Amino acid sequence: MAKEEAITVTGVVQEALPNAMFRVELENGHEVLAHISGKMRKFHIRVLPGDKVSVELSPYDLTRGRITFRPR
């Protein structure tokens, strides 16, 4: 189990980068670099610029995150 719990925030995808990375602007105005979670990759869930997503951030590095959810 993780030592520290992840911080979950919502944001909007600004641009798609190579290697399934995305630049996401969070609600509070910060920009983070995020990759898609394994389950989203497994079920071929598409993420496009302009999509609203949920991002998990590690308390150790708040500049990188994992996209965990994209509402329909």
Swiss-Prot record:
Query: Cross-referenced Gene3D superfamilies, in alphabetical order?
Result: Nucleic acid-binding proteins
The record's listing under Pfam families reads: eIF-1a (PF01176)
Q: Where in the cell is it found?
A: Cytoplasm
The record's section on CDD domains has: S1_IF1 (cd04451)
Family matches, as InterPro entries: NA-bd_OB-fold, RNA-binding_domain_S1_IF1, S1_domain, TIF_IF1
Per UniProt, residues of the S1-like domain are 1-72
**GO molecular function terms here?**
ribosome binding; rRNA binding; translation initiation factor activity
State any GO CC term.
cytosol
Q: Which keywords annotate this record? A: Cytoplasm, Initiation factor, Protein biosynthesis, RNA-binding, rRNA-binding
Which superkingdom heads the taxonomic lineage of this protein's source? Answer: Bacteria
SMART domains in the record, alphabetically? S1
Say if the entry is tagged with keyword Cell inner membrane. no
* PROSITE patterns for the chain: S1_IF1_TYPE
Quaternary arrangement and interactors, per the entry?
Answer: Component of the 30S ribosomal translation pre-initiation complex which assembles on the 30S ribosome in the order IF-2 and IF-3, IF-1 and N-formylmethionyl-tRNA(fMet); mRNA recruitment can occur at any time during PIC assembly.
Family named by the database record:
Belongs to the IF-1 family.
Main function? One of the essential components for the initiation of protein synthesis. Stabilizes the binding of IF-2 and IF-3 on the 30S subunit to which N-formylmethionyl-tRNA(fMet) subsequently binds. Helps modulate mRNA selection, yielding the 30S pre-initiation complex (PIC). Upon addition of the 50S ribosomal subunit IF-1, IF-2 and IF-3 are released leaving the mature 70S translation initiation complex.
The protein, known as: Translation initiation factor IF-1 1
Q: Which species is the source of this protein?
A: Oleidesulfovibrio alaskensis (strain ATCC BAA-1058 / DSM 17464 / G20)
